[in-house]
Amino acid sequence: MPTPASPSIAGLLLAGGRATRMDGVDKGLQLLDGTPLALHVLRRLAPQVDETLISANRHADRYAELGAPFDARIIADETPDFPGPLAGLLAGMRAARAPLVACSPCDTPYLPVDLVARLRAALDAQQADIAMAVTVDAQQVRSPQPTFALLRTSLADDLAARLAAGDRKVRAWYARHKTVEVEFRDERAFYNANSWQELAALARR
């Protein structure tokens, strides 16, 4: 969607991880049906937001190519040691022109097309700081999905302080703020590739 003068929500693709369970490859650039995983996600995330950011600590030129159709900006962590998704989130919160950031990992090609709208509705209804997706399976088992979230960029300074103190756990930081959980019944929409086996399984779905 075209970016208005004052965008309300920035979309943040988290593609800055180490992918240690995949031999250190750049996970977002791995192919699913001939298309990089990151591009699958961008095609679903970008139409839901007003501006698009890609957190990438490697292969910035390649991500710039993938993000060009969405006018995406490439950003990198402020620290060089791959401290996890919170570092990418902080970089996105500081780079965003919008007051809200919706984040997603780069390896979830079936991302819900209504993800951001549902997170925004819950955030506003509860006057929360963070809205986080939670999947619910057929047995009613709830599984938090902390890297699928909508956050206020005003939390950036607190996040920076926690990272400086050595904190790396996403849900522990969320617990410091008013967080609302948003239930999604379609588990498939949140399937990702943390291993070569899981990437192969995605191709079969």
Question: Where would I find each of the regions flagged by the language model?
Answer:
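Nucleotide and nucleotide-moiety/phosphate-recognizing core
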Residues: 2-167, 172-191, 196-201
